[in-house]
Amino acid sequence: MAFLVFQLQAPLAAWGDTAVGEYRGSHNWPGESALVGLLGAALGIRREDDAAHMALSRGYGFAVGVLSQGALLRDYHTAQVPGRAALKKRPHATRRDELAVPKDELHTILSTRDYRQNVGYLIAVQPLVDAPHDLP
């Protein structure tokens, strides 16, 4: 059976964890969603093409070997957000819409984000029966 095997290395990475409230953690390794996105980008698939990404997710199996989980880097952010009353008054589909309120209706919030420094992974991609693309 053929596999696509490659290394991922980065001086700084974040592998999204569940983000609730002001804390955005990071896993120690890339998850399936990140690997499907990376594979999709390499194939030229647009981020908005949900059907193509679902086909990648169903069509391949992924394995991650952690060569170096790196060190934790915790960063603190500030962001401006409108109050709830301001949002009730207007539609807000984008971040730009959220900030298009009078300045005195904006509030500052603090958030914490985790990153991993100097990470290294060995990734193996295995095509399954319904893989949409052949491996090189």
Model-derived segments and spans:
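Glycine/small-residue-rich interface belts in oligomeric ring/scaffold proteins
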Residues: 2, 17-91
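Generic preference for well-ordered secondary structure
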Residues: 13, 19-23, 48, 99, ...
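Charged, low-complexity intrinsically disordered regulatory segments in eukaryotic signaling
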Residues: 1-7
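Short polar catalytic/cofactor-binding loops
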Residues: 8-14
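Internal, well-folded beta-alpha domain core
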Residues: 66-136
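Short, surface-exposed beta-edge/turn micro-motifs
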Residues: 1, 61, 118-122
